[in-house]
């Protein structure tokens, strides 16, 4: 659950993770293969704080890679605080609720390329995990993995197919092979 809160004179997003909403076995695969978290013991009692730390770490990586995403502010146990993407009236809409054009498509593909160039794969990219507020922002990054993860290639392929299918439904001509080639281009 994500809430809007006030810090000083600015809005922030406060994301609270609950064990009841996290499926231990399904998220374990995103942590165990990620070398950045290889020294962390993972059991049912520790999974939520590890998942929060993983999202914070991935947000930091995207900030360093200049990929638009909420700026991480801090975390504690099951709580993550980050910059708020939206206005006084409400949060920025998910991409699924935005009028889509080729410029938005280009921003998404460019963001995927920047992530890949910085050895990051979102691993759950879809129209639900991107916001639009003057530009595209990538969100929900706890499952994002480093390129050394044994399933990184599979996750990247799934992201490419999801993105391609979404934009095709909105009349944008896409080709997963060309997307893959562009993302991996040095």
From Swiss-Prot:
The protein's matches in SUPFAM superfamilies, at most eight in alphabetical order, are given as: Protein kinase-like (PK-like) (SSF56112)
Binding, Mg(2+): 129, 140
Which Gene3D superfamilies does the record cross-reference, listed alphabetically?
Answer: Phosphorylase Kinase, domain 1 (3.30.200.20), Transferase(Phosphotransferase) domain 1 (1.10.510.10)
Q: Which domain of life is it from?
A: Archaea
Entry binding sites for ATP: 15
Q: What does the protein in this record do?
A: Despite the protein kinase domain is proposed to act predominantly as an ATPase.
Protein name (record): RIO-type serine/threonine-protein kinase Rio1
Q: What is the lineage of its organism?
A: Archaea, Methanobacteriati, Thermoplasmatota, Thermoplasmata, Thermoplasmatales
Q: Which gene encodes it?
A: rio1
């Amino acid at each position: 659950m994500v809430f809007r809160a006030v810090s000083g004179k600015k809005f922030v997003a406060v994301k609270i993770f609950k064990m009841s909403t996290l499926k231990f076995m399904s998220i374990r695969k995103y942590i165990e293969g990620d070398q950045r978290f290889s020294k962390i013991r993972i059991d049912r009692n520790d999974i939520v704080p590890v998942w929060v730390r993983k999202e914070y770490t991935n947000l930091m990586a995207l900030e360093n890679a200049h990929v638009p995403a909420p700026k991480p502010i801090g975390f504690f146990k099951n709580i993550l605080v980050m910059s708020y993407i939206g206005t006084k009236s409400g949060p920025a809409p998910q991409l699924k609720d935005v009028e889509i054009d080729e410029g938005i498509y280009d921003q998404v593909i460019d963001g995927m390329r920047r992530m890949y160039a910085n050895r990051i794969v979102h691993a759950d990219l879809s129209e639900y995990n991107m916001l639009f507020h003057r530009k595209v922002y990538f969100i929900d990054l706890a499952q994002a993995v480093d390129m050394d993860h044994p399933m990184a290639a599979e996750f990247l392929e799934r992201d490419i197919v999801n993105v391609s299918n979404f934009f095709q439904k909105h009349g944008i001509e896409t080709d997963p092979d060309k997307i893959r080639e562009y993302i991996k281009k040095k």
